[in-house]
Amino acid sequence: MPLVANSDLPAFERLREEGETVIPRDVALHQDIREMHIGLLNMMPDAALAATERQFFRLIGESNQIAQFYIHPFTLKEIQRSLEANHYVERYYQTFEQIQAEGLDALIITGANVTQPQLSLEPFWKPLIKVISWAYENVTSTLCSCLATHAVLDFRYGQKRRRLSSKRWGVYSHRVVNRSHPLVRGVNTRFDVPHSRFNEISRDQFEAAGLHVLAESEKGGAHLAVSEDLFRIVFCQGHPEYDSISLLKEYKREILRFASGQRDNYPPFPENYFSPKIQAILEEYQEQIIIARDKDLPLPQLPEPLIVDYLDNTWHDTAEAIINNWMGNVYQITHSDRKRPFMEDIAPDDPLGLRRPT
């Protein structure tokens, strides 16, 4: 169903150009269709701010529930940004105080760049806890992506993420391990998810916290899980929202870090992402980069036109199905008053009625 362009945020026009259904606010007001209000706490760095909006907006807009989706982006002022990015946020984003006053039906919390050895030392730590704590009491369901999952497991459940021996970077096959949960209804029992992280929460840690793992990977680890009530918090360790080119952009960034001396070794390929044909192109490019760096020559451009058309996206349809299920279940139990999380007959400790004895 359609996204509603409830502000001048450039993401709406970009998505419209890509073929997504986006309707003007004045048109939406004349349609007799229920509204749903979804918050997006966007903690990503400046360069990824707008792309992250589009990735999550697209997944929500592709849901086929009978509702108009109003998306409310906001961020945390404690995250350091450029002057240009701050102007962008001031123009297009709401404040957390506005979000609290108006209410939400659902909330998505993105990942973030970290600079400290422990999450609790990050400048955004306490404000993030405030948002998550408010959401648990006032929002029907919160979806946590990557670092947000690690933060919730840390402060709410006492499970600290653990450093991996090497970066988990690539596209990994996952298997649904709880096929009866509504979030994975109609989803392929095996599906791919991109990962890009140095740390993880293991399945044992999820289960020690009383949480329920729904999908995991032999190489990628636990990906999808839900809180003890089976719905109010949804955890993702991977990045199902990623575009086809997201890992390519990360790979390009790491090449530039190598060329500038910020990393010692040339970056490896993200696992299970580049085809043999693309790898051959990139191996030749690696030789050119090393020569340019060693001889202090201008760096050659990454031959993206030769690469992009051969990148396969093997995860988006499953991500779309899971978000569709999430939105559908929120729709079924959220209160018509967006300041209230549940309808009167919904039990907060079992909102989907999955724990009731049969």
From Swiss-Prot:
Catalytic residues identified in the record: C146, H239, E241
SUPFAM superfamilies referenced in this protein's UniProt entry, alphabetically: Class I glutamine amidotransferase-like
Pathway of action: Amino-acid biosynthesis; L-methionine biosynthesis via de novo pathway; O-succinyl-L-homoserine from L-homoserine: step 1/1
Positions marked as site (Important for acyl-CoA specificity): N113, L147
One GO MF term: homoserine O-succinyltransferase activity
One of the record's GO cellular component terms: cytoplasm
Signal peptide range in chain numbering: none
Ligand binding (substrate): K167, S196, R253
Pfam family, one: HTS
Similarity annotation: Belongs to the MetA family.
Protein name: Homoserine O-succinyltransferase
